[in-house]
């Protein structure tokens, strides 16, 4: 059974002490828009409301980036990743990168 690690946006883990900082870990994914979904999204943009196709795409991208970051932390033998953050950037027309990063640590 694979060990679960703690993922938190805070700098500390309650009731635990950082024994060792292992370094920055990250996971990323680049996603492109589907032409058909882009047309539907454009129509929704005219009338207003949530663009569900993009919401779903970004949710999936966040999870993929987070899972890749966790995989890197496990390779280092981390017990936790603290100070986790997400960022996005446009890599080219119609495509965006989602990056998850944090500090891998061992806990006492």
Swiss-Prot record:
Q: Which domain of life is it from?
A: Archaea
* Bilayer-spanning residue ranges: none
- Signal peptide bounds: none
- Record-linked HAMAP family: UPF0145
State the family it belongs to: Belongs to the UPF0145 family.
For this entry, the protein name equals: UPF0145 protein AF_0869
